[in-house]
Amino acid sequence: MQQYQALLRDILENGHKRGDRTGVGTIGVFGRQMRFDLSEGFPMVTTKRLHLRSIIVELLWFLRGDTNIAYLKENGVSIWDEWADENGDLGPVYGKQWRSWATPNGEAIDQIQWVLNEIRTNPNSRRLIVSAWNPADVNDMALPPCHCLFQFNVMDGKLNCQLYQRSADVFLGVPFNIASYALLTMMMARATGLQPGEFVHTFGDAHLYLNHLEQAELQLTREPRDLPTIHMNPDKADLFGWEYEDFRVDGYAPHPHIKAPVAV
């Protein structure tokens, strides 16, 4: 995961200091990209320990089309707690947009199912896109989508994915985003009979919060270790039929966790 370490270093060395919505302040850069060949291992940051359960359960929650934290809480995941209202609702966030994008005539578009069908029937398409950025709904979301658009591509029997992330909390959020979309690519590949190819992570505003700088410096003193491998239940292929227990990561031997506050 030298790519991730290089992004941390780039921000610390070249980042511009700015105020932000949270009041904490950031230093950041604009327009960066990382690439991960999924045949080389599961891209899970090793210079600090990540909570794998949160990554997997959140992705399954997105794919359910869910926007209430009850499912997350039932599965021991608390990463969305700060943004939920008293009923656990988050408004029309990722799951709603992925699975039930509202149309002007009162119907809904299941973008994930549409892309699945299109990959199977028209793999050369350049329209294999899912967007979570819905201007009509943004003001009703507890947190507008940071990872807001992704595109699939089929080449030589391999499924590739590129994510555009408009806003990237590089210390806390990005390690989760890398692993989440890498796993989504693998799940989509399984569902469409393809091999996982490359995950490309493209950033708009990539930043470190000012209260994460010491943690980032500490992380840069650590040498990345070998990537783990992720095993998926060989009996499963339905994209919407997975459960947390269907996944197992082997060979994950990271450096210790680094604690840092969340900017809300």
Swiss-Prot record:
EC annotation from Swiss-Prot or TrEMBL: 2.1.1.45
Catalysis performed (reactions): dUMP + (6R)-5,10-methylene-5,6,7,8-tetrahydrofolate = 7,8-dihydrofolate + dTMP
Binding site for (6R)-5,10-methylene-5,6,7,8-tetrahydrofolate: H51, D169, A263
Active site feature: C146
GO molecular function, one term: thymidylate synthase activity
Gene3D superfamilies: Thymidylate synthase/dCMP hydroxymethylase domain
GO cellular component, one term: cytosol
Keywords assigned: Cytoplasm, Methyltransferase, Nucleotide biosynthesis, Transferase
GO biological process, one term: dTMP biosynthetic process
Keyword Transferase among UniProt keywords: yes
InterPro entries reported for this sequence: Thymidate_synth/dCMP_Mease, Thymidate_synth/dCMP_Mease_dom, Thymidate_synth/dCMP_Mease_sf, Thymidylate_synthase, Thymidylate_synthase_AS
Enzyme class: transferase
Binding site for dUMP: R21, R126, R127, R166, S167, A168, D169, N177, H207, L208, Y209
Cystine bridges: none
General function of this protein: Catalyzes the reductive methylation of 2'-deoxyuridine-5'-monophosphate (dUMP) to 2'-deoxythymidine-5'-monophosphate (dTMP) while utilizing 5,10-methylenetetrahydrofolate (mTHF) as the methyl donor and reductant in the reaction, yielding dihydrofolate (DHF) as a by-product. This enzymatic reaction provides an intracellular de novo source of dTMP, an essential precursor for DNA biosynthesis.
Subunit annotation: Homodimer.
Similarity comment: family membership: Belongs to the thymidylate synthase family. Bacterial-type ThyA subfamily.
Protein name: Thymidylate synthase
Organism ancestry: Bacteria, Pseudomonadati, Pseudomonadota, Alphaproteobacteria, Hyphomonadales
Gene name tied to this protein: thyA
